[in-house]
Amino acid sequence: MHILGIDPGSRKCGYAIISYASNKLSLITAGFINITTTHLQEQILDLIEALDCLLDRYEVHEVAIEDIFFGYNPKSVIKLAQFRGALSLKILERVGNFSEYTPLQVKKALTGNGKAAKEQVAFMVKRLLHITSEIKPLDISDAIAVAIMHAQRLKLY
């Protein structure tokens, strides 16, 4: 089973695909979609095209998306919600369903502490998947963490 984890962002959207087979999790691919244009419509199209390419290249059975973190800038939250809505629609179209998890849920599931720092989450991701190299930017480790949490929720791992 392949699980796609997504950490949506307004400039970088982290993604990771993990595999569950023979009672073991492994990382298939991870990276980020870099959003460079400044026009909202183009940003959304770039994001959706990149997600389409990812879904064309890899077979995905389950998708988990990190829920929006409500910051202090309402304009940023609205923009992020628009990106997330576009991602959700594309995932429903291509995969059929997705699950959502808050940052607090993901941090608690991986570290035991819902207020853990991103670096602590990255440490646990590396430990659980036996990754020896550094994971940068942290959007990538967040996406991997979302996928791992989803595997835990499905009682796969």
Swiss-Prot record:
Q: What is this protein called?
A: Crossover junction endodeoxyribonuclease RuvC
Output a single Gene Ontology CC term carried by this record.
Answer: Holliday junction resolvase complex
Cited InterPro entries: RNaseH-like_sf (IPR012337), RNaseH_sf (IPR036397), X-over_junc_endoDNase_Mg_BS (IPR020563), X-over_junc_endoDNase_RuvC (IPR002176)
Location in the cell: Cytoplasm
Q: What is its main location?
A: cytoplasm
Could you say which EC number(s) this protein's record lists? 3.1.21.10
Q: Which NCBIfam families match?
A: ruvC
Alphabetically sorted, this entry's keywords are: Cytoplasm, DNA damage, DNA recombination, DNA repair, DNA-binding, Endonuclease, Hydrolase, Magnesium, Metal-binding, Nuclease
- Which prosthetic group or cofactor does it need? Mg(2+)
- Which residues of the sequence carry a binding annotation for Mg(2+) 1? D7, D139
| Residues reported in the UniProt entry to bind Mg(2+) 2 | E66
- UniProt enzyme class: hydrolase
Tell me which family the UniProt entry assigns to this protein: Belongs to the RuvC family.
Q: Which gene encodes it?
A: ruvC
Question: Where are the catalytic residues?
Answer: D7, E66, D139
In its UniProt record, which GO terms are filed under biological process?
DNA recombination; DNA repair
Matching CDD domains, A to Z? RuvC
Q: How does it assemble?
A: Homodimer which binds Holliday junction (HJ) DNA. The HJ becomes 2-fold symmetrical on binding to RuvC with unstacked arms; it has a different conformation from HJ DNA in complex with RuvA. In the full resolvosome a probable DNA-RuvA(4)-RuvB(12)-RuvC(2) complex forms which resolves the HJ.
Which catalysed reactions does the entry list for this protein? Endonucleolytic cleavage at a junction such as a reciprocal single-stranded crossover between two homologous DNA duplexes (Holliday junction)
Q: What does this protein do?
A: The RuvA-RuvB-RuvC complex processes Holliday junction (HJ) DNA during genetic recombination and DNA repair. Endonuclease that resolves HJ intermediates. Cleaves cruciform DNA by making single-stranded nicks across the HJ at symmetrical positions within the homologous arms, yielding a 5'-phosphate and a 3'-hydroxyl group; requires a central core of homology in the junction. The consensus cleavage sequence is 5'-(A/T)TT(C/G)-3'. Cleavage occurs on the 3'-side of the TT dinucleotide at the point of strand exchange.
The root-end lineage is: Bacteria, Pseudomonadati, Campylobacterota, Epsilonproteobacteria, Campylobacterales
Q: Describe cofactor binding as the record notes it.
A: Binds 2 Mg(2+) ion per subunit.
Single GO term (MF): DNA binding
